[in-house]
Amino acid sequence: MATSPDKINMEYYIGNKKENFAPINVYDDGEFTYFKMKRSFKDMPVVFMQEVDGNFTEVPVDVNDVTNGNNILKVRKVSKKIRFTVGKKTINIINQNYGR
């Protein structure tokens, strides 16, 4: 079932967009979070999402749309703060519409 357009949240801040593994944009449908990646991205980030208690937990990433050529990563969760990590590099992503 498709999500109606008024349910899509695209209010995300993406820090350090210059990194190769930084998403171009981020959006969610209230249940899943989607990360549109650059065509040139090579390093798969480890994705951490902030829990209600403030701690970050690594979450599984669905890469099905990457292998299909769409370059979209999907996480089965929505969170206020997200971290992409590759090696010692980290990108912080903030859901500016979380809880509204």
Predicted regions, residues:
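Beta-sandwich interaction modules
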Residues: V66-S79
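Solvent-exposed beta-strand/loop surfaces of large extracellular or lumenal domains
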Residues: M49-G69
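Short, aromatic- and glycine-rich surface loops/edge beta-strands on solvent-exposed regions
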Residues: S79-T90
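Short edge beta-strand/loop segments characteristic of extracellular beta-sandwich folds
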Residues: E31-K38
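Beta-strand-rich binding/interaction modules
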Residues: M44-F48
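Edge beta-strands of extracellular beta-sandwich domains
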Residues: E58-P60, K88-R100
